[in-house]
Amino acid sequence: MKLIRMNKVSLIFFFIVSSIISQNNTEVYLFDITKTTDGYELNNKLNISNNEGYDNQPHFYDNNTLLFASSRDGQTDIVKYTIDTGEKKFINYTKNGGEYSPQRIPNSKDISAVRLDNSGLQRLYKYNINSGVSEEIIPNLKVAYPLWYNDHVLFSAVIGENALELVKSDLNNNSNNILEKNIGRSLHKIPNTNLISFISKK
């Protein structure tokens, strides 16, 4: 899995390394990428998760802060990593479940994450990045992979009866509309357009 953020000539690069033996042992690495005459060069490899177990789904909160899901004590919580200091801090501790897919909510300091409770209940929550206090964003929708389009509209891969469904949610009017059935996990905004991309499995 790759997550790239451009910054003029140089950029920061994430690479998730999975163990050949166990897919649950993953790490999040940080690189400097320098543009050269032949292309790009990776330098200064740094394992920023450095944790046994599941570490995945990195997301830039801002130019100096990264979010990712990381396992501890048998569950998965949200980590905030500060680039210039190397500080790593868990922002929440959910006793009855775990979090995945952390993202910053546009025009907000809060973040969202998918919470999977031990009971099997799966929902999208909002978290205060400092206190970790959370609240449910979309009731009764089993969000698996969210994509924020703006601060009140998001597209999600939602778990349906037999496959993932592409759902558009508008928080201003509490609407959820199924746009496509049988899609993949990958949702992205297309740069410099008003479009998003998704994988259709039809």
Positions of PLM-derived features:
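Bacterial Sec-dependent N-terminal signal peptides
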Residues: 1-25
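Sequence signature of WD/YWTD-type beta-propeller architectures
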Residues: 22-202
